Amino acid sequence: FPLKDAFDALSWLASQQTYPQFYWQQRNGDEEAVVLGAITRFTSLDQAQRFLRQHPEHADLRIWGLNAFDPSQGNLLLPRLEWRRCGGKATLRLTLFSESSLQHDAIQAKEFIATLVSIKPLPGLHLTTTREQHWPDKTGWTQLIELATKTIAEGELDKVVLARATDLHFASPVNAAAMMAASRRLNLNCYHFYMAFDGENAFLGSSPERLWRRRDKALRTEALAGTVANNPDDKQAQQL
């Protein structure tokens, strides 16, 4: 069906009270998806791909979710409801699946539909930081830089990408979907992904690069270590 310009899939997803919730937007913005609910879950790519191979009659069926560096710790799902946009056209898919009774799953799907609510605007982000901690700290970070430059100077490496983790605490709960929306506005030309496991736990990010893409036996990767937008204030950017 044709899209209305005012429709924001992420806002609609965040308005629902069913979990898990998953959002994804392709880097150039041509493809976008939201999925809601899980009929069945998979902990690895192998499990998910095996399931898809068992249902070749549904070539457009997709499994969504998150991979992990540990192949057995993924969080992949066959969604109850999938909205997918390609260009200016969108499709809405409600999936029924059961290993024992499709009739019973149809009843559950009907109950699921009854829980859906209208779209609500996402709230703005007004956060007050109460604690900020970096790993490594400034001393450790300086040591890493010195080690990296020394290693490059000695010819052992041509390039190295340093990274650190930051733990932020706020005075009030963070609306993860609103943070995803803010990142989407700021970090252009990125892959945006968001998964809410429940009302209090979510995983999200905006990456300018794709580590890899595999289609059948073809594996494609690209040069990594790009950048995303930094704070416009030079002092804040320096601190970050």
Predicted regions and their residues:
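Secondary-structure boundary elements
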Residues: T142-Q143, L147-D158, R185-N187, F197-G199, ...
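SIR2/sirtuin-family catalytic core signature
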Residues: A171-L219
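Cytosolic ligand/metal-binding cores
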Residues: G87-L116, S206, L211-L240
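Short Lys/Arg-enriched alpha/beta "domain-start" segment
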Residues: F1-H55, D167-F170
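Short, surface-exposed beta-strand/loop "edge" segments at domain boundaries and coil↔beta transitions
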Residues: N28-G37, G74-N75, S98-A106, N201-L204, ...
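A short, Trp-centered hydrophobic/proline-enriched beta-strand micro-motif
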Residues: T18-Q26, R62-W64, D158-V160, C190-M195
